[in-house]
């Protein structure tokens, strides 16, 4: 098990290094004045192991720098063979079946490649290439799955991320009273709901921490 975890860690490190190097070469290709938008994405997966788990749902919203929604993008449930759903752990089984997501996936006619292409097309129409960061909660996890399963989408985004969970952790340490009135999560475990909650949460921190 330890050897396997080390191999996974090395694989992730290689992916991240090559990813940053690739995007760093094109930092100057962004269009001046249009790089302040944030691309919010959220994925629902069969688990958190990128070596074996799959993307079940993907959604995207674009905001300006002040967190005003400029465009609400696509939200796709992705169809998979039955064995993918059967391989989920107990937590995912409970929440994804209860939310109705698995039923949506089973009835969806969109596969992973099609979802990736449609998300990429949406980004191409709304933001310049490699200009806007990815936003979300614990969004580094989503980024790893995007890097592996949606590489063209990953390559279109800026290499930086805006992780709301980082701000929450800092507030907990430096301004704990701020968290008492922070927006509460509904825990629907659906992509669009999670994005909207992340935007609302960051707007709260913006108003109360970044005065």
From Swiss-Prot:
The protein's name in its UniProt record: Probable oligoribonuclease
Signal peptide range: none
Main function: 3'-to-5' exoribonuclease specific for small oligoribonucleotides.
Family: Belongs to the oligoribonuclease family.
Keywords recorded for this protein, A-Z: Exonuclease, Hydrolase, Nuclease
Keyword field contains Nuclease: yes
Family matches, as Gene3D superfamilies: Ribonuclease H-like superfamily/Ribonuclease H
Annotated GO CC locations: mitochondrial matrix; mitochondrion; nucleus
SUPFAM superfamilies named in the record: Ribonuclease H-like
Pfam (any one): RNase_T
The Exonuclease domain, residue ranges: 38-202
EC number: 3.1.15.-
SMART domains reported for this sequence: EXOIII (SM00479)
GO biological process entries: nucleobase-containing compound metabolic process
Species in which this protein is naturally found: Drosophila melanogaster (Fruit fly)
GO molecular-function terms, A-Z: 3'-5' exonuclease activity; 3'-5'-RNA exonuclease activity; nucleic acid binding
């Amino acid at each position: 098990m330890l050897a396997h975890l080390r191999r996974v860690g090395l694989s992730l490190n290689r992916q991240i290094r090559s990813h940053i190097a690739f995007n760093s070469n094109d930092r100057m290709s962004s269009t001046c004045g249009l790089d302040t938008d944030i691309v919010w994405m959220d994925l629902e997966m069969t688990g958190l192991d990128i070596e074996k788990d799959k993307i079940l749902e993907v959604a995207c919203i674009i905001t300006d720098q002040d967190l005003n929604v400029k465009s609400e993008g696509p939200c796709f449930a992705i169809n998979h063979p039955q064995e993918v759903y059967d391989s989920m752990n107990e937590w995912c089984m409970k929440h994804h079946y209860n939310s109705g997501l698995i039923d949506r996936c089973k009835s969806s006619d969109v596969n992973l490649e099609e979802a990736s292409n449609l998300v990429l097309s949406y980004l191409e129409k709304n933001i310049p290439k490699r200009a806007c960061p990815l936003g979300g909660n614990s969004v580094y996890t989503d980024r790893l799955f995007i890097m592996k399963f949606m590489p063209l989408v990953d390559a279109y985004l800026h290499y930086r991320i805006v992780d709301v969970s980082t701000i929450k952790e800092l507030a907990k340490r430096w301004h704990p009273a701020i968290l008492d009135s922070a927006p509460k999560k509904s825990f629907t475990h659906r992509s669009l709901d999670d994005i909207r909650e992340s935007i609302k949460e960051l707007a709260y921190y913006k108003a109360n921490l970044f005065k």
